[in-house]
Curated annotation (Swiss-Prot):
Alphabetically ordered keywords of this record: Cytoplasm, Methyltransferase, rRNA processing, S-adenosyl-L-methionine, Transferase
Purpose: Specifically methylates the N7 position of guanine in position 527 of 16S rRNA.
EC number: 2.1.1.170
Superkingdom assignment: Bacteria
Subcellular locations according to the entry: Cytoplasm
Main location: cytoplasm
This protein's name: Ribosomal RNA small subunit methyltransferase G
A cellular component annotation (GO) from this entry: cytosol
Classification via NCBIfam families: rsmG_gidB
Matches recorded under Gene3D superfamilies: Vaccinia Virus protein VP39
Transferase in keyword set: yes
Keyword Cell division on entry: no
Length: 205
C-alpha cells in the first residue's frame, strides 16, 4: 500500500495537484471498494487495483484543473468516474452523479456512506430526465461527443461548460456547425502511455 501511496504522490506532483494524506487514503479506500464490488457486480472492465490506479484515478485527476465553479454533474458516472475522484479532491464542490443502472448508484451510495463524502449526490435516472443548473457537465462514458451534447444540451448556458473525456477517437463532426466554442486539450495521464483528450464545449457569447 505504501508503494501505491508513493505512486499517487508522484502522479499528484506531475499534475501539479496539492492533496492531503487523508485524501490519498480516501482515494485508495474508494478503489478498494470498487475492486470489491467489481467482483460481484461488474462495475468496470478493469479488475486490478493497480490498473485502476492509473486508468481510473489518475485519468480522472488529469482533468481536475478544468473544473470551474462549485457544482458538477457527472453523466453516466458508472462506478463514480470521474465524479468520486474529483469530489475527494474538491470537498467544497457539489457533485451530482447520474447513472441509469441501479446497482452502480447503490455502490455510490455505499461509497458516500463509507467515505463520508457529503458532497456527492448519486441519482438513479437518465440524464435527459434530470433538471438543474451546474457549472460543469462532465462525462467519460460516451463514445460520441455528439451524443453527449445532444443528451445534455439542455444544461448548457452562457455561464457553464461541458467536458467530454475521450481517448484517441474524437467524434464531434456535427458540433462544428452549431453556435458553440469547442476547445480540445491533450491530456497527459501519469504512468499511462495512451492518448487522452478533453473536449470543452461552451456557448458562444
Amino acid at each position: 500500500m505504501d508503494i501505491m501511496k508513493d505512486k499517487i504522490r508522484q502522479a499528484l506532483s506531475e499534475l501539479d495537484i496539492l492533496a492531503t494524506e487523508v485524501q490519498i487514503d480516501q482515494w485508495l479506500d474508494y478503489l478498494k471498494l470498487l475492486e470489491k464490488w467489481n467482483k460481484v457486480y461488474n462495475m468496470t472492465a478493469i479488475k486490478n487495483i493497480d490498473e485502476m490506479l492509473v486508468k481510473h484515478l489518475f485519468d480522472s485527476l488529469a482533468v481536475a484543473k478544468y473544473i470551474k465553479g462549485d457544482s458538477t454533474v457527472d453523466v453516466g458516472t458508472g462506478g463514480g468516474l470521474p465524479g468520486v475522484v474529483l469530489a475527494i479532491l474538491y470537498p467544497q464542490h457539489q457533485f451530482t452523479l447520474v447513472d441509469s443502472v441501479g446497482k452502480k448508484i447503490m455502490f455510490l451510495k455505499n461509497v458516500k456512506k463509507s467515505l463520508s463524502l457529503n458532497n456527492i449526490n448519486p441519482l438513479n435516472t437518465r440524464i435527459e430526465n434530470l433538471e438543474g443548473n451546474f457549472d460543469n457537465i462532465i462525462s467519460r462514458a460516451f463514445s460520441s461527443v455528439d451524443t453527449f451534447y445532444e443528451l445534455c444540451k439542455h444544461f448548457l448556458t452562457e455561464h457553464n461548460q461541458m467536458l467530454a473525456m475521450k481517448g484517441r477517437d474524437l467524434e464531434e463532426r456535427n458540433l462544428e456547425s452549431l453556435h458553440l466554442n469547442i476547445e480540445k486539450y491533450s491530456i497527459k495521464v501519469p504512468f499511462l502511455n495512451a492518448e487522452r483528450n478533453l473536449i470543452v464545449i461552451r456557448k458562444k457569447l
